[in-house]
Structure formats: C-alpha cells, structure tokens
C-alpha cells in the first residue's frame, strides 16, 4: 500500500501506492526521486507525502533537466499525465530567440529521454502553449492533424475534426490522447471525422433555421441569412448591437431590425414564462434548485426527464443526462456527485 522513505536527519516520508508508477517496485536501499506534495501537521510527527505519479513530478523533472526554465527564459504552463505511459507538458518561451520545444527535447533528445527513463518509459509530448485556446488545443492534439475546429465558449468545449484515417490516432489508445489534451487545456474536446462534424453542424443549422422561422415569423430565406451570419439563438438576435445587424446585406432598415429584435425578446419572455409555469407544476424540490451551479433552465430540462428531487438526480448516470444540450458531461458529473454527496454521504 505504501513505502517509507528515509530522508536523512531522522526525517521520513510516505509514498502511497497510487503515487508510484504502475509496475514500479522498490527494494530496501533503493534511491527514490519524488516530489513532496503534502504535509499532514496533525499527526504526532509531521507526516510528509511524496509522489512520482502526479503532474508536479513531471514539471520538476523538466526544471532539473532544462536550465532555461530555472532561468525563466522558458515557462511551463501545464502538464497532464497517464503515469508510466504517456504525458503532455505545455511550454512557452519568454525569449523569442529560444525554441521552447527544441530546448525541452535537448540535443538528440537527451533531455526528454532522461525524463522518460526516470518515469519508467513514460512518453512525453512537448506542446507549444498558445494564448489562442483553439491553437493551443490543436497543438495539444499532436501527433494528430486537426483539419478544423469549432469553439463553443458557452459550454467551454470544442468540436475537433480530423480525417477519417487519422481518427484512431487523434483519440489514442483507450482515449488516451484526447483525454490528456483535455486535461492539459481545460477544454472539453469532442473528436470526430470531418464528415461527422459537417453533418453535426448541418443538423444544428437546420434546428436554428426552424427556430427562427417558428419564433420570429421569418420566411426561410430571411432565417437562412441569420444562420449564415452565425446567429444561433434568440438571445443573440435580441441583444446584439443594432450596428452588427445593419452591417448584414438586406438588413440595412433599422425599423425592420427593431421589429425583429422585438419579436425575439417577446419570444424569449414567452418561453421563460412557460418554463416557469412548468417548473411550478413539476413541484421541483428546493434542494435540487439550490444545488451549486444549478439554474432554473437546467432544472426545467431535468424535470422533463422526470428528475425533480435530489435523490432522483443522485441515481442518474452521466449517460442518462447526455441528451440535455445545455449540460456538458463534466457538468452532469458534477451535479450527480454533488447530489450523491448530499443524499448518500452526508453525516446529517
């Protein structure tokens, strides 16, 4: 379960099994490199915890092997690991004369190879950090080549398209490549083929087109203009600056725009009133409504699935909520775990 490390001067540290690399075994007398990540001051003698499996270990090894990092010419912006198997680390240069990836790789790969050897053969992808999130994700997906990418700021997710013959490499064995890229960048990444991405967004465009025709009373040609200009919701139409609408060919008439935005606002108000009425009829439990991160719209979507109490939410799986478009898989998991913590694990 764990081993004790003698640090000298009568000091000891603990390294738990989960903080070791897979298939890693130590014998008495072995020298072990690790990172101190936690101190438990409540024990009789302050207990020190060391890890070899957390991202901090990878980061510190790069600090040791790449002197430019210590000199602040290079900066580590993040790391993600599948310990003992594969990792990704993001770096940026604070000196335009230095190639951050080349500096981390080293002459003939010597620097990164030393780190790989220390971590039991763990293969490390060195990723060039970028302040443009889309470009950063493209870099993080290497060695896969991304053909196109669509960013969803609201859900903090991206749809990534690759050629069909590159899909397996992009996803990686057991999803490893996309999982590490997700952890590194902090974005939810949906990988698919170029054809699948086109089909998905064509379906979404048709859905928005029908929404505008139905709720705004527009003919198909007018609604298509809005879709082509990138409008995806009634809220965008209602509250976008008038100057952006007048810049669209065929929408130069401000009276027409005023009427269009008025219809959009009326439709939003009507939908909110209908949703509020449905919430009252659903008799949703206050504990569910008061869950951290919950809003009335998501609560309404849950009620449509006959989930009106915290206990009912706790019994769900992430897949059960997958058809709620407003929820990412991560958000669904957070809601479910929060409900379980309150219903199943609370001491009250």
Give short role names for the model-derived ranges:
Residues 1-348:
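RNA-contacting regions in translation and RNA-metabolism proteins
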